[in-house]
């Protein structure tokens, strides 16, 4: 689930933090990186749990209304399609989800007001109204309802994103990426797979985890060497006016260019130029592109870089 885009973001953040703290302990910083990646994976499960929690809350609300003094006919006989959703019932029994949630201690139990706000947002949506009116009653309809809710109501919702950012500092830059993986998971669910339905693993393969660790280590262990090369190519720039994050981005980009021969140079450059646009100044992308392009040409002339 954790792709290389997210890995690069996390490495940049931890390398930046490492220097801000005054060149701390490398092993401690590496553990912080792995912890940060684990938190991204937690968020994936929190999104899946959110579906179950809002359903459970609505079930409790309907049950409470039935038991109140002099309930109306509508309260005694509510439309239960939302709480009887077959996709949600399957998700709630998923073996992998239950195991991970139990092991990591994940829960929305202290966030009832937030869950209530999410539920109200869903219940007031046109998607919900259409779902109740839909004459087709099937597992596919139930799953599609939640796919649409997640895509159009939850993803990009400012209230939800702000709450998640406040809930964990590790999620500030993860939400949009992790939302796409939760959405893909909903789409892949099949009724016949029951509780054995596969969820996304933390890493697609061991190679991605190794990529994260190696990129981080090389960025710091050879940081002095990379900084000297960067400084040489910035002689026409006013160094004191260059954002510190620009230097970090170029340093990590060089670590990737020189440490991973199978990754095309243009792929690496594009990824870090995009990161610069997001994490640094508006002009950083152009500046970083120019410096890195100059360094790459120099490395090729020195026969230190043999890939394209």
Region locations from a protein language model:
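Class I Rossmann-like S-adenosyl-L-methionine
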Residues: 1-308
């Amino acid at each position: 689930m954790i792709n290389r885009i997210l890995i690069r973001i996390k490495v940049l953040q931890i390398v930046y933090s490492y220097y801000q703290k005054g060149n701390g302990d490398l092993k401690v910083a590496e553990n912080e990186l792995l912890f940060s990646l684990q938190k991204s994976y937690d968020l994936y499960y929190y999104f899946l749990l959110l579906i179950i929690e809002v359903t459970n809350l609505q079930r409790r609300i309907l049950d409470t209304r039935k038991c109140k003094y002099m309930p109306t006919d509508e309260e005694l006989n509510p439309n239960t399609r939302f709480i009887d959703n077959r996709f949600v019932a399957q998700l709630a029994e998923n073996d992998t989800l239950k195991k991970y949630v139990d092991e990591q201690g994940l829960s929305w139990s202290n966030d009832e007001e937030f869950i209530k706000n999410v539920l109200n947002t869903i219940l007031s949506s046109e998607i919900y109204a259409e779902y109740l009116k839909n004459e087709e009653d099937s597992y596919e309809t139930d799953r599609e309802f939640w796919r649409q809710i997640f895509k159009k109501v939850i993803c990009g919702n400012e209230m939800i994103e702000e709450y998640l950012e406040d809930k964990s500092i590790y999620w500030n830059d993860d939400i949009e990426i992790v939302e796409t993986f939760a959405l893909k998971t909903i789409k892949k669910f099949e009724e016949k797979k029951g509780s054995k339905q596969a969820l996304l693993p933390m890493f697609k393969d061991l190679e991605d985890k190794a990529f994260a660790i190696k990129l981080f280590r090389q960025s710091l262990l050879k940081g002095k060497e990379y900084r000297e090369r960067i400084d040489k190519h910035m002689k026409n720039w006013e160094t004191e006016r260059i954002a510190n994050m620009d230097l970090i981005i170029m340093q990590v980009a060089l670590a990737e260019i020189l440490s991973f021969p199978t990754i095309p140079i243009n792929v690496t450059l594009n990824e870090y130029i995009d990161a610069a646009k997001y994490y640094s100044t508006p002009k950083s992308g152009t500046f970083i592109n120019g410096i890195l392009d100059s360094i790459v040409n120099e490395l090729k002339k020195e026969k230190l870089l043999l890939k394209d």
